[in-house]
Regions:
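N-terminal pre-domain/capping segments
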Residues: 1-94
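A general structural motif
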Residues: 1, 33, 60-64, 102, ...
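Acidic/histidine-rich catalytic cores of soluble enzymes
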Residues: 131-226
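Well-ordered, non-membrane alpha-helical segments in soluble/globular domains
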Residues: 21-22, 90, 124-129, 192-201
Length: 226
């Protein structure tokens, strides 16, 4: 089943007098939508009781939940402290996902600035394997980590980089941000054939079953050569 919904709370939600994310599932249901990506982009600051309340509302209104982990994650950092914090941010997001009855956590992998891209991939794979192992130890293995394609050239997040990363564990699901692919390609991923080529590439690398499960973002975007 294909589901549609917003990432975060829209301006129209607040314009209509609503104020709490707990109200989002009912509002989305009324809008004819059936998915909600809760934003932890600035940190995992939600408490357990509120997360459970959102999750209960989502179950009641048949809203499929996911969480976006903090934007400042960098699993490619060569600084051990920064890498450890990044892993912790993902684990915290996964714990919040359990509370919220979410099954997916969307993750920005990090920056490749100053690092050879092949080396960056090796570091990302190592860091992600460690993250998954620790998640399993914490009983969080039922939550899928969903690394996202990113739009800036110096970020880890080409389509092939994300697919390669997802090969390390079948529970991983790629997040395909078509706006980011459009920006990264200089405006080339913007037609039916180009969208189809992306989906065909996912199936080629990860297989049809995971293609059916992909997480996708669509949004307007402006871009520069960087």
């Amino acid at each position: 089943m294909i589901r549609f919904g917003p990432s975060g709370n829209s301006k129209s939600f607040y314009d209509q007098g609503y104020s709490s994310s707990v109200q989002m599932p009912a509002w989305l249901k009324n809008m004819g939508l059936n998915a909600y990506e809760y934003q932890c982009s600035k940190g995992v600051n939600i408490g357990k009781s509120k997360a459970i309340e959102i999750g209960e509302q989502a179950k009641e209104h048949d809203i499929y939940m996911s969480i976006h982990a903090p934007y400042y994650i960098n699993l490619i950092s060569e600084d051990p402290e920064k890498k450890e914090k990044s892993i912790q941010y993902i684990l915290q997001s996964m714990e919040a996902a359990v509370w919220m009855y979410a099954e997916r956590v969307v993750v920005h992998v990090g920056s490749c600035t100053g690092i050879d891209r092949k080396e960056a991939l090796k570091i990302a794979i190592s860091s992600m394997k460690e993250t998954i192992a620790r998640a399993d130890d914490l009983g969080l293995g039922n939550i899928s980590i969903c690394p996202e394609t990113l739009g800036k050239i110096n970020q880890f997040g080409t389509l092939d980089e994300i697919l390669e990363l997802c090969l390390i564990d079948e529970r991983m699901i790629p997040t395909i941000d078509f706006g980011h692919l459009y920006a990264r390609s200089g405006g080339k991923v913007n037609s039916v054939d180009e969208f189809a080529a992306v989906l065909e590439r996912i199936e080629e690398v990860l297989g049809y079953e995971r293609l059916k499960k992909i997480h996708a973002h669509f949004s307007r975007i402006e871009f520069t050569s960087g």
